[in-house]
Amino acid sequence: VTTQDIVGKLWKLCDVLRDDGITYHQYVTELTYILFLKMAKETGAEDSIPAGYRWDDLAALDGIELKKFYRQLLEYLGTECQGRIREIYNGASTSIDEPANLKKLITSIDELDWFSAKEEGLGNLYEGLLEKNANEKKSGAGQYFTPRPLIDVMTKLVKPQAGEKCNDPACGTFGFMIAAFQYVYSHTNGFMDLDGDQAQFEYEKAFTGCELVHDTHRLALMNAMLHEIEGRIMLGDTLSPLGKNLDGYDVVLTNPPFGTKKGGERASRDDLDVLTSNKQLNFLQHIYKSLKKDGKARAAVVLPDNVLFADGDGAKIRANLMDKCNLHTILRLPTGIFYAQGVKTNVLFFTRGTSDKDNTREVWFYDLRTNMPSFGKTNPLKQEHFADFMKAYEAEDRTKVEDERWSVVSRAEIAAKGDSLDLGLIKDDSIVDYEDLPDPLTAAENAADTLEEAVDMLRAVAKELKQLGV
């Protein structure tokens, strides 16, 4: 039994709950509450859960008693417990109305092959569920899932080292930090090359994040816990004053959310160089501010095309970035890997300088977009798609790389173009600006209206056919 099989079974259970009108995202959250108790039992970690509120206590009940106890359990764990458990269950409520559905969910989870699941790693199992959820629900609240192959490529090229502080200021379900943890783990012989204090630092302090959306924050905590990572994951907005304290990092890996701040207001940070309502530009400013000023601290960040072209504030922020950091590489990503087919994104790789001036001399571009297939559900992005880019990136002498997708532009040429980074590329006319994307709620309401109209028309046709005796 593979992780995929178990994920498939857990996912099928969602159909049971569709009758209760539960969305996929609510299902994953609900599943997290129940899975947590089962996984604690399976891994011998039940001591951290108060007696009377454990898996067996839940599994023993049914009917209205079960429903009542489950609600009580959620509230108790979210208020009376300490640490991670309290964070995961804080403010938890259930969307399951029908006790029989809740019982079916508990029974089905109990019947899964937990021996195989443990062999494969419970963390992998949970990440599989999160990925499935992301594919079912590509957009919404500006949240989306970064494809694992892209996370792995970015992590491999940034090369986090033991002893370094790594952070994701918009951490979603914590995928980047888990990849960074696994990278360090595998490059230190499972931390065996480190002494006790060093290994403890990796587990407890090296990998941290911040997430704005409460439900997503829960999933991040659960994901981290299943991978034995105890680093702090804050619930809050990096672009609020809270973000000022997120600094002194050696490595930042992130894919900040799409869209503008609600209502287009400016970030409430007073320490950013340029005040703008463009969320990605604010995240970019936060990231280069949050790196240690030591000539080694580095970041890889997924950003939309408008960050490369926006004039005014955008040009100022890019000039700042190129002054304070060596922006050495930009990877133009193919389309279709995020929720909206037309949305175009890039990965910016940069290293913080020791000074605040003239750190970028030239920028290398790799165009992985032009003449590439569009990726999506039927054509998923895989790590091999990045092989040529990785070869060019890691080349000892970048000028000797023979690849038509690889080009370099000097800082002077960039300045001559008003600090636009729309250079060295085949012009593509289908650029979508994030500001022009419809608000997810409006888009959903419009779609619902259209479907209702279609249903009404079909009913009218059926009625007419009936009258005609067809």
Model-flagged regions — what are they?
Residues 11, 200, 228-233, 263-267, ...:
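Short acidic (Asp/Glu) and glycine-rich catalytic loops that position anionic groups and cofactors
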Residues 1-162, 232-243, 332-336, 359-376, ...:
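Non-catalytic, mostly N-terminal accessory regions of nucleic-acid modification and defense proteins
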Residues 242-244, 259-262, 309-312, 339-342, ...:
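Switch/connector loops and helix/strand junctions flanking conserved nucleotide-binding motifs
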Residues 140-254, 259-261, 270, 275-277, ...:
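Conserved S-adenosyl-L-methionine
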Residues 343-347, 376, 386:
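Short hydrophobic/aromatic beta-strand or adjacent loop that forms the aromatic wall/cage
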Residues 27, 212-217, 277-350:
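Conserved Class I SAM-dependent methyltransferase catalytic core
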Residues 40, 351-355:
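Short loop segments at secondary-structure junctions
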Residues 203, 248, 252, 343-344, ...:
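A generic structural signal for well-ordered coil/turn residues at beta-strand boundaries
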